[in-house]
Amino acid sequence: TMNKQDLISKIKQLDGVTQDERAYLINLVNTKKKYGLVWEDKREDVEEQLRNNLPVLKEVKDKAIINGEDNPNHILIEGDNLHALTALTFTHEGKIDVIYIDPPYNTGNKDFKYNDSFVDKEDSYRHSKWLSFMDKRLRIAKRLLSEKGIIFISIDDYEQATLKLLCDEIFTEMNFVGNIVWQRSYAPINLKKTISQNHDFILIYCKQEFATLELNKLPRSE
């Protein structure tokens, strides 16, 4: 999926169209309205590196843990997550059944880096940077999911509503499975001026309609 600037660049390169036709198409892109999120896409340095370089995974044999030939093989990848996800599209596209991610929550408290710099609460492009960051990675994650694949995404109140809209756009509302609310703190906390929060969320989406998923396998407990 192209962002607006990439689409406009493609239109400018089209052959066989007049200047008036080109101007009309660009105006159409600029004025098109849609339901959902709109943000200013922010380029990442790691994304620019992918334009001319192919990420390659290198095995570090002295860190291997041998667990027997008949046991499952697992891979631990160290590196930038956008590079790692891109590399996996060459080997695991459409092959992964379950993905769990715990992305930066974008609280403004030095939990989110963009181009090697922390994004703080004073950054006027804070939400655009976070959305650009998440959009690129979630679209690749969707490619990695198998047809019966499902993804779990941890988040808190800062970006939960925004993330839901973004995921509805990427995975479609039809593939929204549910939103788990879980208690992350049991100690009394009074850090908020209004309502104290002791919970986080896990958004769940599947690649295809979740009617194909085998749900409700555990009996209801006391």
Regions found by a protein language model. Give the residues of each.
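Alpha-amylase-like alpha-glycosidases and glucanotransferases acting on alpha-linked glucans and related
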Residues: 120-144, 191, 196-202
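Conserved nucleotide-binding/hydrolysis micro-motifs of P-loop NTPases
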Residues: 104-107, 158-160, 185-187, 208-211
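Short, solvent-exposed loop/turn and secondary-structure capping segments
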Residues: 88, 108-115, 163-165, 179, ...
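Conserved Class I SAM-dependent methyltransferase catalytic core
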Residues: 127-180
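DnaQ-like (DEDDh/DEDDy) 3′-5′ exonuclease domain used for proofreading
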Residues: 1-100, 106-130, 136
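Flexible, glycine-/basic-rich loop-and-beta segments that form/coincide
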Residues: 187-222
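Beta-sheet entry/capping signal
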Residues: 73-75, 95-100, 148-152, 160, ...
